[in-house]
Amino acid sequence: MWLLAAHQVLRKMQRRHSSNTDNIPPERSRSQALSPEASVDEGGVFESLKAETASPPALFSGLAGGLPASPFPAGLVLGSTAGGGDVFIPMPATRDEAGGRSAEGSTYHHRQAHHHFHHGAHRGGSLLQHVGGDHRGHSEEGVDEQPGTPAPALSELKAVISWLQKGLPFILILLAKLCFQHKLGIAVCIGMASTFAYANSTLREQVSLKEKRSVLVILWILAFLAGNTMYVLYTFSSQQLYSSLIFLKPNLETLDFFDLLWIVGIADFVLKYITIALKCLIVALPKIILAVKSKGKFYLVIEELSQLFRSLVPIQLWYKYIMGDDSSNSYFLGGVLIVLYSLCKSFDICGRVGGLRKALKLLCTSQNYGVRATGQQCTEAGAVCAICQAEFRDPMILLCQHVFCEECLCLWLDRERTCPLCRSVAVDTLRCWKDGATSAHLQVY
């Protein structure tokens, strides 16, 4: 009885299975014929997976581009409720079925591929454009920043030049007004500076001539300097400018900045004239009284003493200018400024005193640049001085074995430190101001 019931159930299942296999596609009939156990789900699983079998090629059609879509191979899909997923087993297909399916799949995938390709291309293109745009933006910003962005110093320089271009006319107008107000003082200073330059250059020329100097030229320099000094002091006698030479205040109602420069400038030029006049007297002395080789030391002492005295003259004038006429209004500020001025001035005076001390020490000591040369050494040297191009007079030989006249050598070493021929160091002492020159520095403080 149990066998009969089991046989009837199997017959019903076979009939039901045969009715289901008559209406399914060839691919499914083939797969179910190979695996009849997959029909247990009563046809529910395969109906839901019909549309999903074509979706995998459609998803990747956007990335494939223009490549032909490959047919999705036939296989067996098993439903699994315990695992929560589907298992796909690929199965080979025949040529006819593959050809027909590829034709149908190509038409179906062409529509879906167009949609997915357009969407994927739009999405991928926008991403690439965004990345490329950022890259180009950064590159363009880098290109613009290198040559286009000026350095801070260059921008400040351009701003200064622009400001000067705009303000230059007003600056010139202001300078023209100041020059017109002080035209007399500017003219006097230019004249005295020209006189100093002429007298200084002429004196140096006479010093270089040694015994051949012209006494008449020296007297002319003395007369020229004395005439200029007397003319200036007489023209402005009402101001008593000579009082500043003996540390007194000139006769001025007020002492502003331009008045201070005027008094200090005139006093400095007068002291320079006196310095040149003293040097002219040294040049005019004959060889019997003072040797030519010793005159350079006296020029040095006179110059150092003159610079020290010139630095002392402006002190009392600057004190009066800093304190002002009514010192009670700015007593604290004036006191601070005087202390600062005194501190700075003390360093300058100490330097001048040190230079004068070295000059006096050099004057009191005899300096030998070499030893007397013998007749044989003079003959080997050519019997002619390389400096004056004449026969040797009181020849001296240096450590480098070069022979020169004593006066020529002393005059040369008053300006240089090395041998005239081999440039080896011959002396390491003060050599400034030994040629009769006077400092052109304007001592205004």
Curated annotation (Swiss-Prot):
Residues 204-215, 278-330 are cytoplasmic. One of its GO terms (cellular component) is membrane. It is found in: Membrane. SUPFAM superfamilies: RING/U-box. Keywords: Membrane, Metal-binding, Transmembrane, Transmembrane helix, Ubl conjugation pathway, Zinc, Zinc-finger. Induction: Expression is induced by IL3 and inhibited by LPS. The keyword Protein biosynthesis does not apply. GO terms for molecular function: ubiquitin protein ligase activity; zinc ion binding. A zinc finger (RING-type) spans 385-423. It is a multi-pass membrane protein. One of its GO terms (biological process) is positive regulation of ERAD pathway. Residues 1-183, 237-256, 352-445 are extracellular. Its main location: membrane. The chain crosses the membrane at residues 184-203, 216-236, 257-277, 331-351. PROSITE patterns: ZF_RING_1 (PS00518), ZF_RING_2 (PS50089). CDD domains: RING-HC_RNFT2. Residues 12-41 are annotated as: Disordered. PANTHER family: RING FINGER AND TRANSMEMBRANE DOMAIN-CONTAINING PROTEIN 2, UNCHARACTERIZED RING FINGER-CONTAINING PROTEIN. E3 ubiquitin-protein ligase that negatively regulates IL3-dependent cellular responses through IL3RA ubiquitination and degradation by the proteasome, having an anti-inflammatory effect. This is RING finger and transmembrane domain-containing protein 2. The lineage of its organism: Eukaryota, Metazoa, Chordata, Craniata, Vertebrata. The gene is Rnft2.
